[in-house]
Amino acid sequence: MNQINNSTLTFQCETGNYHTFCPISCVAWLYQKIEDSFFLVIGTKTCGYFLQNSMGVMIFAEPRYAMAELEEGDISAQINDYEELKRLCTQIKNDRNPSVIVFIGTCTTEIIKMDLEGIAPKLEAEIGIPIVVARANGLDYTFTQGEDTVLASLIQRCPSKDRETEKINKNNSSLFPSLSIFSKNKNESNLSQDKPNLPLVLFGSLPNSLTNQLEHELEKQNIKISGWLPTKNYKELPVIHEGDYVCGVNPYLARTATNLIRRRKCKLISAPFPIGPDGTRAWIEKICSIFNIEPTGLDEREKAVWDSLENYLPLVKGKSVFFMGDNLLELSIARFLIRCGMIVPEIGIPYLHKRYQEAEIKLLEDTCRKMQVPTPLIIEKPDNYEELKRIEQYRPDLVITGMANANPLEARGINTKWSVEFTFAQIHGFSNARDILELVTRSLRRKNYIQQLGWKELVE
């Protein structure tokens, strides 16, 4: 058995398979976030069954996504992929007329080497609708990384010039060529007066209520957001210039961050993620430090949140929680729960990008030191069989796991919580810390209720 280090985090990597949801499930929240989009998932019947069951949307609701089901003729190359996709996209254009069509590649398109990147530009020119290709296959990516691949593909579609300024300059240059330079300088001076800080683009798909909350928190520190990726409408993608600052709000967007740095020459703000009051405060403080702003009011804001959690903290204090690894939110949630008084012996995580999560890892270490608890063992790509043996040895009070392992663990008398619930719950910002603890304590309270009824044989 591996010993837990009390001072620094210990990282290990096993050779286990991904025990997660398929990454094409990102369609579930992205098609609702980008309201003028249409997602076309290109896969097999299995992909279709998964989407239909996981999303729970009936066909008569006409959702803005669909399945392009591959048949034997596609796999044996007897059917022309371009003509079939052209037929489907033309039908989508006539029926829904979206601003963008997103091709979602699956495991099957990877295996048969379907050239979606080669087909998309030709098809886009022919039907007149932008087509973005995202490979969200379960061979290479985990559950939430599907969003990462979509956002990484959208980066190249973000404009490098402000649309209104470009339109004004174009009209001025055509009507009054001699005034074009003067107009450009005037616009630049006005922009510099309106924006005291450098442009800041936040990336990560969150409900509109959460984006408004985070924007409001930054506006209190006199920091204005220049854009979000993704946006409510495809035509409103943020303007990204070389040298702009970017900051992520979710731990699973490493590919998006890399593309912003390498392709658009942006400067990444490495900050902890705004999950829990401690993470949200650290996130704001890091952004303020980049813009040389002294943050104000954060002590009172964080204290008020912790005071509001007084009813939950006694339920979790001293309890142990084990993370089996599913949605890449494990480090952030574990850090918050340790701050609440819980003990985390092990964190399983399907994939860990240490550079992108560097600040989160540092905050996790500091939190363990502050709470005077052992640092957890972090295992990347955990082997499921070995993981279950360690759970039997630890006997934690709660295991946060994927749906596949929940019932077997419950049968062994171990409390579980589905990790997918944290993916779809609103857990970001100061005001949503209560929702995290509500999810965590629900299983603990349920066991207490059953024991009070005298049904101990069901849980022991």
UniProtKB/Swiss-Prot annotation:
Annotated disulfide bonds: none
User: Which CDD domains is this protein grouped with?
Assistant: Pchlide_reductase_N
Question: Which GO molecular function entries does the Swiss-Prot or TrEMBL record give?
Answer: 4 iron, 4 sulfur cluster binding; ATP binding; metal ion binding; oxidoreductase activity, acting on iron-sulfur proteins as donors; oxidoreductase activity, acting on the CH-CH group of donors, iron-sulfur protein as acceptor
Detail which positions bind [4Fe-4S] cluster: 22, 47, 107
Q: What class of enzyme is it?
A: oxidoreductase
Arranged from A to Z, the UniProt key words for this protein are: 4Fe-4S, ATP-binding, Chlorophyll biosynthesis, Cyanelle, Iron, Iron-sulfur, Metal-binding, Nucleotide-binding, Oxidoreductase, Photosynthesis, Plastid
Q: What is this protein called?
A: Light-independent protochlorophyllide reductase subunit N
Species per Swiss-Prot/TrEMBL record: Cyanophora paradoxa
